[in-house]
């Protein structure tokens, strides 16, 4: 399918602060051309079934903590799936046609939820914040923000930042790249509350693994340095209108491959 920009599409407004988030940083680092299509050109994309399943599981895990601790069980989580999926389809009616085998769809979501209960016991703690929006005016030119799946504050004050992933954990040696997202959240929390989070935790439901890290102030300083470098690179790309593609194995899953200059002479 050939994608064309709509004539009514909003242009990038250069006199507004650059909005940065972990996902936007990752997009630009992986492929500036993809960043341009999504952020600058604002080209529409159809929903991804994997992403929508992730949204469904995230919603159920969010709502699970509305229950009393004794009712935070695998069965009560699974019972939330149909109603949350209906709400998701109301928001995106096109999902109704995309999911051709609803039983298989629910079975996979149920499997991810059952895996969650092998990694944590949600009856044993209270989630202080869910879907917490952290933001900071990084500078006059940069607005940094992100949404934390869950943030727990212990009675003794220690802070744990948790992110659910419905995919598999990164291979050994690639954990640092995965943890960058949570280090950005830790930096945002530190800038807002002057408290250094005690633990960063990525929960991978695809293979039942957990990646943990204890951040330090030097970690946050290094993260801030990366953010400023990426922002500087984005501003340079905007000024030059230069968005070089970075061909990789990810291209086969990219919706914009048909219009990407790396794949079209």
Model-derived segments and spans:
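An N-terminal structural lobe/cap that precedes and organizes the functional/catalytic core
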Residues: 15-16, 20, 36
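Metal-dependent nuclease catalytic regions and adjoining charged, substrate-binding loops involved
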Residues: 1-3, 7-10, 19, 75, ...
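Nuclease catalytic cores
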Residues: 25-26, 30-70, 106-114, 127-132
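Generic recognition of stable, solvent-exposed alpha-helical segments in well-folded globular domains
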Residues: 20-23, 32, 52-59, 104, ...
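Short acidic (Asp/Glu) and glycine-rich catalytic loops that position anionic groups and cofactors
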Residues: 34-41, 58-61, 88-91, 162-166, ...
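Mg2+/Mn2+-dependent nuclease catalytic core
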Residues: 132-224
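Short, compositionally biased low-complexity segments
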Residues: 27-35, 52-56, 73-93, 195-205
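A non-catalytic, helix-rich entry segment at domain boundaries
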Residues: 60-130, 137
């Amino acid at each position: 399918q050939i994608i064309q920009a709509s004539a009514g599409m909003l242009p990038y407004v250069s006199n507004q602060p650059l909005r940065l988030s972990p996902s936007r940083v990752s997009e630009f680092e992986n492929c500036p051309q993809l960043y341009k299509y999504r952020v600058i050109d604002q080209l529409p994309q159809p929903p991804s079934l994997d992403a929508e399943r992730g949204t469904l599981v995230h919603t159920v895990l969010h709502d699970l903590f509305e229950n009393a601790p004794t009712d935070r069980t695998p069965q009560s989580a699974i019972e939330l799936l149909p109603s949350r999926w209906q709400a998701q389809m109301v928001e995106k009616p096109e999902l109704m046609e995309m999911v051709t085998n609803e039983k298989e769809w629910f079975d996979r979501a149920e499997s991810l939820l059952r895996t969650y209960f092998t990694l944590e016991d949600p009856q044993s703690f209270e989630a202080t914040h869910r879907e917490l929006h952290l933001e900071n005016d990084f500078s006059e030119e940069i607005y940094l923000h992100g949404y934390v799946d869950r943030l727990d504050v212990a009675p003794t004050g220690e802070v744990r930042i948790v992110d659910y992933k419905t995919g598999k954990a990164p291979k050994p040696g690639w954990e640092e790249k995965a943890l960058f997202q949570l280090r950005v959240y830790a930096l945002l929390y530190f800038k807002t509350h002057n408290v250094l989070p005690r633990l960063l935790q990525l929960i991978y439901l695809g293979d039942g693994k957990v990646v943990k890290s204890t951040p330090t102030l030097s970690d946050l300083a290094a993260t801030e340095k990366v953010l400023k470098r990426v922002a500087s690179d984005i501003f340079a790309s905007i000024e030059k209108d230069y968005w070089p593609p970075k061909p990789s194995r990810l291209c086969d899953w990219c919706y914009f491959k048909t219009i990407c200059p790396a794949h079209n002479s």
